[in-house]
Amino acid sequence: MLLHIPALFEKDEVRRIREALEQADWADGKITAGYQSAKAKHNLQLPEGHPLAKEIGAAMLERLWKNPLFMSAALPHKVFPPLLNCYTAGGSFDFHIDNAVRQPKGSIERVRTDLSATLFFSEPEDYDGGELEIQDTFGTQRVKLPAGDMVLYPGTSLHKVNAVTRGARYASFFWTQSLVREDSQRALLFEMDGAIQQLTHDMPDHPSLIRLTGTYHNLLRRWVEV
């Protein structure tokens, strides 16, 4: 399942974040890549623990845990602290699959990467190229969203960032360990939750609503890992 989550940040917030990122001291993006990924990765990144990365990451997490679309689709258990990257002219990240487990720097906590996400901080017209290209059961999708918008997709997906040929592409990326490991089960629960919410709006007194809600929670009980 690939999901577009709009307006996690408002435009004025994005502008302030981008201005701060433009003034930041960036490091080689290979610092967080695995052995295979490092050979394919050509970008810049704020080091883990960088004050600006921590500030932006905390603001992102605050919004994510309050976002109904993210909560319904991801069913989050743990979220890896968001990282920040920058692609300038010539920057790219060839096809790869994210590591299955990530460990934040200085932490004993481990996060299984069930879901990957990218939050865009540059407007599409500010750079050429730089599309996030994702291959999975839903086919091949090229994603280049407005600043402040986010895309959520399975961590098992083969994906790349196409070369930037003009401008700069600022973004955040992170991973989520879901309460439900299997993507097809999460997709089913997401569809069911959406149907329940729509039915609640259209026919709040319908007798089937309680039964459908009960079925949703019984499926959660069967599939959730805590």
From Swiss-Prot:
Its EC number is 1.14.11.-. 2-oxoglutarate binds at R169. Disulfide bonds: none annotated. GO terms for molecular function: 2-oxoglutarate-dependent dioxygenase activity; iron ion binding; L-ascorbic acid binding. Fe cation binds at H96, D98, H159. Residues 78-178 form the Fe2OG dioxygenase domain. Binds 1 Fe(2+) ion per subunit. The keyword Metal-binding applies. It comes from the Bacteria. Transmembrane segments: none annotated. Keywords: Dioxygenase, Iron, Metal-binding, Oxidoreductase, Vitamin C. Gene3D superfamilies: q2cbj1_9rhob like domain, Rabenosyn, Rab binding domain. InterPro entries: Oxoglu/Fe-dep_dioxygenase_dom, PKHD_C, PKHD_hydroxylase, Pro_4_hyd_alph, Pro_4_hyd_alph_FE2OG_OXY. One of its GO terms (biological process) is intracellular iron ion homeostasis. Its cofactor is Fe(2+); L-ascorbate. The keyword Oxidoreductase applies. NCBIfam families: PRK05467.1-3, PRK05467.1-4. HAMAP family: Hydroxyl_YbiX. This is PKHD-type hydroxylase Pfl01_0799.
